[in-house]
Amino acid sequence: DMARWMGMDPAEKKDIAWNASSKRFMQGWYDKVLRPMERDGIDFWWLDWQQWDNDKEFPRLSNVWWINYTTFTDMERHHDTRPMLYHRWGGLGNHRYQIGFSGDAIISWKSLDFQPYYNSTASNVLYGYWSHDIGGHMGADSINPEMYIRWMQFGAFSPILRTHSTKNAGLNKEPWVFADKERDIIRDIIKQRYSLAPYIYTMARHAYDTGVSLCRPMYYDYPDAQEAYTNRNEYMFGDNYLVYPITQPMNNGVSLQKVWLPAGNDWYELTSGTMLKGGQTVERRFLLDEYPIYVKAGSIIPQYGDVKNLRRNDEAVTVTVYPGNADAEFVMYEDNGNDKQYATAYASTLLSATHSSEGTLRVSIGARKGEYSGMPAHRQYRLKLVASAVPEKVVVDGKQTDFEYDGNNLSLMVDIPETDCSKAKTIEVVYAKDAPVLTDGLIGK
């Protein structure tokens, strides 16, 4: 079909020269080659240097830049869903179209060590959606489980999490090819990533509206601190998480990591349950299933529970509140997830937490504002208070209710009956006046 479209005889089996600057060639490529496969169920395309650097007729036209643009806009014209494609960096301004992938990464600690810096500083040219070959692509015939787990931990707090490698049976990365302990760690990393989807999606909307990427260097948030420029591999993951991936092998089963914690607020260490003061550099120890993730004190994070996929947006949402003395809020964003009306058709829910001098924490789940196609009318919520003492009582909309307390993880859970999303919910957690805040690193102890 493509040969006939180009005025050639298919029986001659002649090559058709790539010519991205030819409107006829590109129209034929999309309509005769790609479109039939899209009708068979292909949702997005991964383009990968199937052409030379620059166009033959217009030498100053970058083939990568141009094909990213033409593929994105072709999908935009011919599909009801949002365009999506993977391709390489095409130059300044090309961030508008493709999700980038950073090439065939060498399997080495050195390669892993470079990626966090590379990932976050790309935000300086608005290139906020890098994806990487998690675990590395080539340069080895077998997987180092420790290195792969550290790479996965970084990947879970990257814009895109995907594993990839060259065709080599020794480099298979399915969780079940690992030993039980390693498999369980990998599974928990993936589940953690899924659980953060409401938070990540909200921050993705922020990036769309402001140009500030999900992953960005520390100097975006702390421009006056010298440490924000010298800690190259440390970055913010959205507004609430500070991440410093481990990129070196353990010594005697432990990784030592120095982490700079900016002044202005305290930081809750996710793996240990320790609250650390801001304005200092700390050296912390981490086992293989632990890594440096810090949450701003008092943060509210919307999360999913144990979801299997992200096809639906009506999943139960856990409102996780981290310890902190200041009042806090988070505006959770939602839209259809796949249609093209997201610019104007979306909804938001204000989540807030306020403290009273009498020892009561009041958490509010606001009435949802806005609307979009497929929006669920009702939703199940769960409140999770991290580092919480056992309360005297919990009251939901004026009625005392049951709660669960996890003594191992020092957390309080309150299940809220399925609620009309157009109506606000208020949860009051009443503590004794001398109730402690359990941020001394005893989680799991």
Language-model-detected regions and their locations in the chain:
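Generic beta-strand structural signal
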Residues: M236-F237, H355-E358, Y405
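N-terminal, helix-rich and Lys/Arg-enriched segments in bacterial and organellar proteins
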Residues: L34, F44-W49, Y86, L92, ...
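Solvent-exposed beta-strand/loop surfaces of large extracellular or lumenal domains
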Residues: E269-L288, K393-D415
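Beta-strand-connecting loop/turn residues
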Residues: D239-N240, S272, G359-L361, N408-L410
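Accessory, solvent-exposed terminal regions and/or long lumenal/extracellular loops of proteins
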Residues: I293, A297-K399, I416-K423, Y431-K445
